[in-house]
Amino acid sequence: MKYKMKKIIINLTIIIFTVITYSQSDVYSYSENGIINRIIIDNNYLVMTSYKVDSNKFIKTIGGFYNKVGNRFNMSLEFNSNFKNDSISKIEIEKKANWKNISLKKNDLQGKWLMVGRVRNGNEQRRNLNRPRKTMKFLINGYFQWIAFNTETFQFSGSGGGKYITENGKYIENIEYFSRDDSKVGLTLEFDYDVINREWNHKGFSSQGDPLHEIWVKRK
């Protein structure tokens, strides 16, 4: 009887630990041969990006939903910036001892967001979120990354990321990598933000200096 009780307690502990592990949102980093690898994770999605700090060169990014077994993330990719060369749509990533947790303070807007619309010249234009072409922003523990991609064709249209904070209605991001233009690395951009009816209204100027008003909705 005691043995069975111990076994039940151990099994419950394993289940509880697994649930806690799956519910974590963290940002990790490790370096290899001068290349920074950053991993942003929430309870069901993972994005890994590689870039060089010394030259500001973006190398690649992959991302998608995952199932976790032990220290291994089995991923079904939604995007792969190197897909034309390697055709990889599924991958297993192992969390290793050299992964350093670099998570910062959790800010407002934490989570995955899909762009659902824009406002141009006072006119609001909406997107169908079910279409394969998507623009997603992933905000976890003080870090952000946006990605434009097509889930059907694996066409990759661009990505950028870095650190962000939210304070007094301002969303402020510092760019640490940018696939389209390395010269934008180091820029700090400030936007007004407001969440209205669960939609994030994002207003300001783009990295090119153009006015923008984007509307984003949370992705599960």
Range-by-range predicted roles:
Residues 1-27:
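Bacterial Sec-dependent N-terminal signal peptides
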Residues 162:
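Phosphoinositide-binding peripheral membrane targeting modules
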